UniProtKB/Swiss-Prot annotation:
Swiss-Prot/TrEMBL cofactor(s): Mg(2+)
Lineage, highest ranks first: Bacteria, Pseudomonadati, Pseudomonadota, Betaproteobacteria, Burkholderiales
Catalysed reactions, semicolon-separated: apo-[ACP] + CoA = holo-[ACP] + adenosine 3',5'-bisphosphate + H(+)
Enzyme Commission number: 2.7.8.7
Provenance organism: Cupriavidus necator (strain ATCC 17699 / DSM 428 / KCTC 22496 / NCIMB 10442 / H16 / Stanier 337) (Ralstonia eutropha)
Homology family: Belongs to the P-Pant transferase superfamily. AcpS family.
Protein name, per record: Holo-[acyl-carrier-protein] synthase
One matching Pfam family: ACPS
Length: 140
């Protein structure tokens, strides 16, 4: 049953600007250790592909945080979720620490799709609850 959906789009030039202003530290803030290693490998081959990778991961984390209904609030942190690829190429979120426990307590799994094209990176996430009812809207 669908628990929540999230989407995000970012202009790759904005990420490039942040990287320039932070002397590259933005990647270290946003990417988990496995993502960071993959980012450096891609960047070594092509600056443009490295930037696209970073942008898709940023968008994926934003979309993921929206799908689970937390936004970027604890236990959802930049490095608590890494988006890696299965051997088939399918992107799969790997959650760590308290975020993994939070998702398990609620019986949630999340699927993420990412894409980039020249100027933009986009991500879409669907959070699902196994066998449970869909989340109900919360009155504000």
């Amino acid at each position: 049953m669908i628990y929540g959906v999230g989407t995000d789009i970012i202009q790759i030039a904005r990420v490039q600007g942040v990287m320039e202003r932070t002397n590259g530290r933005f990647a270290e803030k946003v990417l988990g250790p496995d993502e960071l290693a993959k980012y450096h490998a891609r960047k070594a081959r092509s600056e443009k592909r490295g930037l696209a990778f970073l942008s898709t991961r940023f968008a994926a984390k934003e979309a993921f945080s929206k799908a689970i209904g937390l936004g970027m609030r604890w236990p959802m942190t930049w490095r608590a979720m890494e988006l890696m690829n299965l051997p088939s190429g399918e992107p799969t979120p790997i959650c760590h620490g308290e975020l993994a426990a939070w998702l398990a307590e609620r019986g949630l799994s999340v699927r993420v799709s990412v894409s980039d094209e020249h100027d933009f990176a986009v991500a879409f996430a669907i959070a699902e609850r196994a066998g449970g009812a869909a989340s109900q809207p919360t009155a504000l």
